[in-house]
């Protein structure tokens, strides 16, 4: 009988900044995401404009209590609904639930002398609720949630001081939750700092006048690499059987034509995304990244033990997000473009697109799994994947057959990668297993979940939960460990 390996971890994923809400409750401080404004008047495919942030924007955000144009302040109101939501996840049969800890719930300003006990107790309750149903928490330590104080008073991860603050934060949460959490991720989509430095690195370009901003970004990235290695050390010392992973954005690139120039461009673009996971897996900077630093005059300041720390504490597994593939060409000026995950790419004429222009490519997931496993020879974990769509609630449910078709095709390609290609895949968590505020466009109407949340792009609604048609589909996939995918 065809089915996934025994012990395969099926589940779903959210991030605190998109799910929780409760932005000023329980002693929580303000985060970079609480100050990220939605731009409903900007083209949803214009990722750069959607995510540009200035110091003036932050000052404006801090002077308002508005939750309409700052939708991550309310999210899906998981802060008040998590027990109800976890019960629904258990009904689907989740083996694992990926979530993040909001740094500012534990240290409201990042540099506080003592942690916030109310925040620590909140996550105790969340993890206990998961474990009550036999659901393993998979915890992201930092998922676009640095306290805003780190931006305004330290210039974010550019400052070496932030490593020490992050390490103290890790020491507190790992000591507190080591008996409840076995699986950890250090930084979400660690490679994304080059594309959105504000949410990932707490960096704002106008705060570095006269500086090479790419150098600023890579300096901040170096600090995150050191911090990630130290976090891995902390977890392993606290719980030797725990597993720590890195997490990258899997941007799978195809050459638009077989012209050697296009093939080379695709290879170079792939390397530009792999350099971050290469560093965390192998514990050292790859030669091609060092060449980039030299050729572009980027000077990274390091402490004497930095490279030693990175080498001694690499990650145990590689996790990633996969939503779509992209086409690239050496000269793309005359080619039609479309949106993708945190970038814009050439439109592939052979595959369909979602409501938001992201191209749907299940085979690309298999290609990604094979590429990553051949490169790293470490267990893999798909921790984000799914279809953002415009769902319509009718008679208390959503007939989202389009989402079922999406998952069905992707799950079959995951199976092929495991059985035919020999990939060691630990598990799968669908992104936004319950509807949450979109990271890229700050919209609630871009829905990914098996569970519909009654809330619109302006925060209006009851926040009541409704099961979609895909809820029962995923429940059946999990209870049969994928065998139902191959039934006639």
Identify the function of each model-found stretch.
Residues 67-81, 158-160:
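Active-site mouth loops of central-metabolism enzymes
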Residues 81-85, 304:
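Alpha-helical scaffolding within the catalytic cores
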Residues 95-102, 136-140:
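Short, well-structured secondary-structure segments
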Residues 101-115:
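Glycine-rich, proline-tolerant flexible connector loops at the mouths of alpha/beta enzymes
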